[in-house]
């Protein structure tokens, strides 16, 4: 039923935009929790799917201001993870990306009382297999993967992917420049976010980040999710260097 499938995809995409927009509003309002659902109501499946997609970025308003992840959002993310397990990956590369995205969400949830509820019978989640660096994958393929992992570029998260970002800021800068030249603004803003993270971490970066973000703001498609990526990047730029 292709028409039904298309309608469902559109509904889920709209839910992602709505959740990203509310998270962005919370970030702009100073870092409080996003109002994603009314208290004591059953979360509809599209909302849970959107929460699953946003993952650790749901807590960007708190993490960027040094606050702890809030309970209602944590509980909703746990429900989404139970209701919608990780999708079957079509390739080893896709499995790697999904694994690291879930690792980021797990790390944030571990700071809350809901962390153990993600998989109560399992031991603490360990990081997925290491992501091949640019020496192995080449800087172009590596930068594309780093863009897919932009949700990891948040304060309070650290691991092998972050060490790659620290070590290979030139690859991030090359990837962001290439994405801008190709008008691939989604990839560009995500790599600029990583560069902002690296600069906040005290690493020298090989690209002026602010003009890149301003250009994306002016010519971007204006989706809520892209605006959230932009806002997180700006928040990282304004953070005190660690």
Where does each model-flagged region fall?
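Polar/charged low-complexity regulatory segments
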Residues: 1-178, 182, 186-201, 205-242
């Amino acid at each position: 039923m292709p028409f039904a499938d298309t309608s469902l995809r559109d509904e889920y995409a709209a839910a992602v935009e709505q959740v990203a927009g509310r998270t962005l509003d919370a970030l702009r309002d100073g870092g409080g929790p996003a109002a994603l659902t009314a208290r004591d109501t059953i979360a509809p499946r599209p909302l849970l799917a959107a929460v699953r997609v946003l993952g650790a970025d749901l807590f960007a308003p708190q993490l960027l201001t040094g606050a702890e992840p809030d309970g209602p959002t944590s509980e909703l993310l746990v429900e989404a993870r139970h209701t919608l397990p990780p999708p079957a990956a079509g390739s080893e590369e896709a499995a790697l990306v999904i694994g690291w995205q879930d690792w980021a969400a797990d790390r944030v949830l571990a700071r809350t009382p809901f962390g153990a509820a993600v998989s109560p019978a399992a031991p603490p989640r360990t990081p997925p297999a290491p992501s091949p660096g640019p020496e192995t994958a080449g800087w172009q393929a590596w930068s594309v993967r780093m863009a897919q992992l932009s949700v990891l570029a948040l304060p309070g998260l650290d691991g092998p992917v972050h060490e790659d970002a620290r070590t290979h800021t030139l690859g991030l800068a090359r990837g962001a420049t290439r994405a801008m030249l190709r008008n691939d603004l989604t990839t560009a803003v995500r790599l600029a976010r990583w560069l902002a993270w690296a600069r906040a971490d005290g690493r020298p970066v090989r690209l002026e980040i602010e003009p890149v973000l301003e250009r994306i703001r002016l010519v971007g498609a204006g989706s809520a999710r892209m605006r959230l990526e932009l806002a997180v990047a700006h928040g990282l730029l304004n953070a005190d260097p660690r």
